[in-house]
Amino acid sequence: MKFNKKTIEDVDVKGKRVLVRCDFNVPLKDGVITDENRLNGALPTIKYLSEHGGKVILCSHLGKAKGPDPSKTLAPVAKRLSELLGREVKFAADDTVVGENAKKAVAELKEGEIVLLENTRFRPEEGKNDDAFSKDLASLADVYVNDAFGTAHRAHCSTVGVTKFVDTAVCGYLIQKELKFLGSAVENPVRPFVAILGGAKVSDKINVINNLLEKVDTLIIGGGMAYTFLKAQGYTIGTSLLEADKVDYAKEMIEKAEAKGVKLLLPIDNIVGAEFKADTKAVTTEDANIPEGYMGLDIGPKTQKLYADAVKEAKTVVWNGPMGVFEFENFAKGTKDVAKAMAESDATTVIGGGDSAAAVNQLGFGDKMTHISTGGGASLEFLEGKELPGIVALNDK
């Protein structure tokens, strides 16, 4: 996949209709947005286009709508964006997304003005990458901008289809930043390159482990998936999470790491509990073995130090997935220590979206990282070495 894509700064947008695919898939409670990260992430691109005289048309999906659904309207987003930008963002209420109301709102736009279209998933064709809806979207635009990394792994009308019917398709600042940090970390890292993988399941990360073993100097494994690896090494794991059908795969990966000269770090002690509950008593094991009747819920203190030391020696660190059940106070220290080591490091530190992004922000280390990816599934596919259709579809430099 080529990372050298044209950006909004490579095109003259003055007087042009610019359709921007944003990621406004935000959590709503009673019509109020409860997490504004994604809105804030979109502001630099919107401001640039508006300040340079573009007629700005924003679009996005919200939730899993399968047709018009008043509970999934983007109206609250238009209202909040207006407040954040300090200028009106008109809302084109339109169940067909590109109906008469939307066309009229776009036709009336003056240079620098902004309108937000209704949820693209109000059209069931959106997810089918259907030509007719793609053409409808393209008919509103002279220039198309994709700034939604979170949906770049999906070939939908608003991310891929539309690019077939416009001549100019470029990326916004958010995607440019993702390509710069995630792209260079994976394709051209400053070494030593350390990747940290956590989360519950080996099966979710199989392709990531496979791909990263070709690229990293050190691979660190924590979280629920570590217990399948410990089992593969012959340790007892008590009642810990185990994917029995992945033990052989874990053995293969341990052998592959050895053959490639990659340091594979696994827990050397664990913090365990009798039950999966926030108030279960936390017990630290002597070594990697977990006694019968207990389940691993976090990496132990020796492991925390081992992992933190590996991070301290790195020049590039990519992290995807927590080290333990960080939602439980007693079992959050492993995740906290890894985040702290990354925050204190002068390496390029990239957080690969999803749970790790939530953990890092929750622990207050967000602003100490070089880059926090805005895509969960998209970052994972990126780390797997897959092409992302929404990025492939943009013009190369």
From Swiss-Prot:
Task: Give the EC number(s) listed in the UniProt record.
Answer: 2.7.2.3
Its ancestry begins with: Bacteria, Bacillati, Bacillota, Clostridia, Eubacteriales
- CDD domains, per the entry: Phosphoglycerate_kinase (cd00318)
Alphabetical GO CC annotations of the entry are:
cytosol
This chain's protein is named Phosphoglycerate kinase
What are the record keywords, sorted?
A: ATP-binding, Cytoplasm, Glycolysis, Kinase, Nucleotide-binding, Transferase
Underlying gene: pgk
**A Gene Ontology MF term for this entry?**
phosphoglycerate kinase activity
> Which InterPro entries is this protein grouped with?
Phosphoglycerate_kinase, Phosphoglycerate_kinase_CS, Phosphoglycerate_kinase_N, Phosphoglycerate_kinase_sf
Reaction(s) the record says it catalyses? (2R)-3-phosphoglycerate + ATP = (2R)-3-phospho-glyceroyl phosphate + ADP
**Subunit composition and interactions:** Monomer.
Q: Name one GO biological process term.
A: glycolytic process
